[in-house]
């Protein structure tokens, strides 16, 4: 042989992988089309294959180039990595690894580092390289200078296969981008796009941590979709699933015949509820693998952030386990110290490599410091889903309006802990599946009450401190639960009620983005003040939102079927307060009967209360009103045109 049998890969290249410090493992392991020097023929091109299988007796690459009979790979000395270079093998080649375990049994495995895979139910890895030329430099530059906590964020959560069934990444780049732009969201969040064999898992049982699912096209097609979103001014968040992985015998589990990526002890290495394996976060190579996966989606696909799934299951050794089914940590506690260290590392590393990105935790417990910086003892996430707010709000919404007065405190409780973390308010896919019903079917009453209540609820949500996330279909009141195998119910999207709700979402996003009072101080107590937190008898909530420059918006939501036509309120400033939103507007399929003629006027109180003012406001039944203080405006005279 007159050339390097490992295609230029050496043991030195793998030291970072073994120490846990290599966060770009995809550049070394897996398959790569490379050109190397042959002593006799000069440069030759082929594919380098490399796979970590330290406990294997033998490893072969099987492929369509060798009629699936196998080419033996050799162990790179001292590395636990098997490699080979095969001349003439190019992009598009299908391959797998055949691994002989310690007991002599052969196992066919897909490449853990595959960057492209066959479409399910087939599962071979595919040799690929990217040829995409990005056109989002301006977007990336703005992102690097951004301050996410003090900027607007309204997120549209999308399952690509269920948005419009059958569309490719490139087709979605036209239709999805156009729709999200019209609706006015700042970001989309994609449910997992890493390769997964079982469609009803929605992508949460990953077998290809570096491989975009081929259901919708090639990796470069996904790059095209993300690029188009960026060019339209829309950020992209991707779901990432480092908490567990499936037991498919051709994937990561028992990869070389031993527990390589997972813990060997099922008390540490298996999720009984989900029937999946748990990563061994304390193993350096596993840490390198996972951190590389996270970095890969941001570096190679220009994702603007990751939403990390099921963080609570990672943090606790006794998560969903009975006594005796888990192993305490070295201090005798229930915290998974290795997972905590891993999460801190991945957050620190990604923020240092890509300033301005978003790291978001789906964390359902009260674990302290999820969004505190690592240097201050926190986990280092930028945001955390506010699951408490979500549960309390939906439970309240499902009540008969008469009974809501007895649960008023559940809606105000979120402000008790609002500033303990940086929150996103999520009404995600999890709330419209598994028999929970769609959002509209959760609400008691007839069509009018249901649509009015939804309009009121989402306006309440958009004005509450925290960023917003809604799952696709909610914006027009889809009536059935989410089903990944069919499209959303677009045929109802423009009917009465549905169309009004869709237009409301468009205006919520527009008004929200135009008014820093609604987002600039989400994580700062200066940005919120109750007007009345205790009006349980009227099911009415009212507060002020403020920005850094003192601009102020008064927000009112009435979850009762009774209008409040002369609702007396105290306000911090006298003068004109302009109505900028009324969910009872005819534009939103409301009645158009309950409004404030475009404004209210707050009169100063006599001494000693000169620092405050008093006014009356009309709040529609099952409705919301937002009023923005307008110090330069003069009160409209009777007969002046106004809007209800």
From Swiss-Prot:
A Pfam short name: CBM_48
UniProt cross-references to InterPro entries, sorted A to Z: A-amylase/branching_C, Branching_enzy, GlgB, GlgB_N_E_set_prok, Glyco_hydro_13_cat_dom, Glyco_hydro_13_N, Glyco_hydro_b, Glycoside_hydrolase_SF
Catalytic activity: Transfers a segment of a (1->4)-alpha-D-glucan chain to a primary hydroxy group in a similar glucan chain
Annotated TM spans: none
Keyword Transferase: yes
A GO-annotated cellular component: cytosol
Record-annotated active site: 309 (nucleophile), 362 (proton donor)
GO biological process: glycogen biosynthetic process
Similarity-based family: Belongs to the glycosyl hydrolase 13 family. GlgB subfamily.
Subunit structure: Monomer.
Function of the protein: Catalyzes the formation of the alpha-1,6-glucosidic linkages in glycogen by scission of a 1,4-alpha-linked oligosaccharide from growing alpha-1,4-glucan chains and the subsequent attachment of the oligosaccharide to the alpha-1,6 position.
Name under which the protein is recorded: 1,4-alpha-glucan branching enzyme GlgB
Species this protein is from: Cutibacterium acnes (strain DSM 16379 / KPA171202)
Lineage: Bacteria, Bacillati, Actinomycetota, Actinomycetes, Propionibacteriales
């Amino acid at each position: 042989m007159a050339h390097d049998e490992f295609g230029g890969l050496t043991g030195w290249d793998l030291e970072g992988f073994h120490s846990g410090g290599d966060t770009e493992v995809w550049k070394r392991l897996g398959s790569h089309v490379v050109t190397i020097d042959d002593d006799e023929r000069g440069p030759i091109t082929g594919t380098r294959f490399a796979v970590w299988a330290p406990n294997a007796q033998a490893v072969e690459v099987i492929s369509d180039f060798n009629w699936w009979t196998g080419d033996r790979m050799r162990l790179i000395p001292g590395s636990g990595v098997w490699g080979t270079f095969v001349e003439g093998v190019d992009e598009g080649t299908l391959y797998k690894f055949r691994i002989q375990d310690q007991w002599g049994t052969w196992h066919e495995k897909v490449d853990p580092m595959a960057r492209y895979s066959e479409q399910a139910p087939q599962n071979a890895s595919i040799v690929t390289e990217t040829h995409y030329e990005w056109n989002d430099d301006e977007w990336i530059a703005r992102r690097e200078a951004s301050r996410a906590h003090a900027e607007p964020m309204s997120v549209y959560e999308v399952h690509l296969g269920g948005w419009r069934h059958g569309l490719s990444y490139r087709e979605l780049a036209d239709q999805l981008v156009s729709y999200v732009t019209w609706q006015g969201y700042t970001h989309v969040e994609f449910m997992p796009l890493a390769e997964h064999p079982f469609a009803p898992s929605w992508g949460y049982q990953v077998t290809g941590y570096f491989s975009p699912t081929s259901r919708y096209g090639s990796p470069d097609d996904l790059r095209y979709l993300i690029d188009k979103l960026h060019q339209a001014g829309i950020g992209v968040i991707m779901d990432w699933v480092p908490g567990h992985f499936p037991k498919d015998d051709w994937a990561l589990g028992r990869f070389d015949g031993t527990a390589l990526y997972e813990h060997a002890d099922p008390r540490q290495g298996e999720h009984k509820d989900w029937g999946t394996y748990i990563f061994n976060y304390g193993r350096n190579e596993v840490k390198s693998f996972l951190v590389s996966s996270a970095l890969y989606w941001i570096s190679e696909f220009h994702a603007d952030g990751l939403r990390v799934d099921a963080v609570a299951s990672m943090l606790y050794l006794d998560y969903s386990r009975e006594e005796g089914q888990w192993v305490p940590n070295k201090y005798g506690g229930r915290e998974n110290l290795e997972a905590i260290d891993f999460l801190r590392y991945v957050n620190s590393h990604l923020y240092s490599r890509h300033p301005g990105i978003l790291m978001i935790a789906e964390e359902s417990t009260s674990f302290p410091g999820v969004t505190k910086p690592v240097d201050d003892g926190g986990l280092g996430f930028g945001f955390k889903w506010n699951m408490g707010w979500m549960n309390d709000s939906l439970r309240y919404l499902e009540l008969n309006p008469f009974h809501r007065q007895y649960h008023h405190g559940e809606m105000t409780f979120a402000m008790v802990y609002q500033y303990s973390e940086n929150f996103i308010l999520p009404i995600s896919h999890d709330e419209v599946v598994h028999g929970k019903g769609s959002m509209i079917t959760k609400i008691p009453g007839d069509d009018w009450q249901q649509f009015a209540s939804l309009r009121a609820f989402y306006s309440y949500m958009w004005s509450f401190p925290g960023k917003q996330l809604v799952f696709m279909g909610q914006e027009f009141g889809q009536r059935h639960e989410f089903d990944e195998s069919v499209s959303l119910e677009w045929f109802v999207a423009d009917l009465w009620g549905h169309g009004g709700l869709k237009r409301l979402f468009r205006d919520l996003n527009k008004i929200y983005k135009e008014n820093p009072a609604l987002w600039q101080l989400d994580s700062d107590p200066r940005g919120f003040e109750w007007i009345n937190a205790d009006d349980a008898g009227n099911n009415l909530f009212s507060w002020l939102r403020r920005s850094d420059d003192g601009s102020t918006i008064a927000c009112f939501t009435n979850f009762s079927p009774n209008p409040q036509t002369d609702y007396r309120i105290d306000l911090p400033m006298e003068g004109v307060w302009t109505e900028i939103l009324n969910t009872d507007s005819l534009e939103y399929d409301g009645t158009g009967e309950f409004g404030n003629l475009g404004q209210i006027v707050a009169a100063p109180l006599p001494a000693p209360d000169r620092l405050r003012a008093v006014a009356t406001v009309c709040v529609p039944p099952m409705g919301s009103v937002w009023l923005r203080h307008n110090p330069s405006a003069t009160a409209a005279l009777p007969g002046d045109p106004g809007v209800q």
